Amino acid sequence: MSLYLPEGFIIKTEDNIKYLSSFENFKEAFKKGVPLEARASSCDKEHNLHIDFGFIEGIIPRGECAVGIDEGTTRDIAIIARVNKPVKFIITDIKEIDGKLTAILSRKILQNRFYQLKLPESKVGDIIDAAVTHLENFGVFCDIGSGINALLPIDNISVSRIPHPNVRFSVGEKIKVIIKNIDE
């Protein structure tokens, strides 16, 4: 189900393109609660993400950008880093702001659904889709669904010793991973 795929996996799908092609289709996605994906075009000084759909402006308010932002467990850099990258969201409202129609979006709702619905049914040994988001000397950070990150340690990447994860992976690469353990 596209709800649980990593960000970037549905941006070019037929359904996503259809729902983002016109205001009428966009409203249909709103009514149905369909998860959509588009590139964040900017981040303002309040750390709200903006998406320009052409026919309407979209805003993901700071607190709706990621799980943990309001609590302080997720840093604002996690929001800023999404600029010019695909973000998955649902439309929570369409209203007039400063004289123009604006779509209010939420990424956090989809992340909460992932934690509440997908993670509990996942088990060690499951093979899942992931997208490489960041490379470090000690491993690869991957989006495992709706912007939720997981670590693939360097010692689990290859049977032979490698000097850095960039020998095997690059940022943005779509991969399959096996769940080794799940932190509570």
Segments predicted by a language model, with ranges:
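Single-stranded RNA-binding regions, centering on S1/OB-family and related RNA-binding modules
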Residues: M1-E184
